[in-house]
Amino acid sequence: MSIVNSSTIGVNLGNSDGATALFGLGNTVNGSDGSQWLYVYATAAMVTGTVACYSTAYVAQPATASNLFGAAGGSPNSGMGLAFAQGTFAAADYGWICIRGADQYVRVSSVSTVGAALYLDTASSGVLTTTAASGTMAGIILLTASSTGVQTAVRAYLQYPRLSPGALFGV
């Protein structure tokens, strides 16, 4: 687990702050292992490794194809960013989500291999898969493999996760 190394007092990385905002939405802090964290409001529950999409108002929810591409698919919703929960959030909680760092958790839906291409799982919100699906991801490299067919959190390297340009333009 990363620890904060910015000068912001009271930061609790990887855990929800509960229903009370302790920092301004959109604040960022740096942590150990080259990590960077963003303070958000979660509109839905998230567990460790959940891929979250957040708006320009720093409101986060588990990522789905419809909240990234709109209900009809096609054009990406403007201003949506991607990050990963490193702890448990209840709906209506505030807390820090990870946008960069080594050795962070990501949630995958099935068997995965180190360095494999990752996609947004269309069957489960906030989950990645190595099976070709909607939204090819970039800026995420798995560091550990999963040998189970159920959702699990595995370690990854994150560098400002995003949809690849091909996913944005239907390529």
Where do the language-model regions lie?
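Glycine-anchored, exposed beta-strand/edge motif detector
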Residues: 1-171
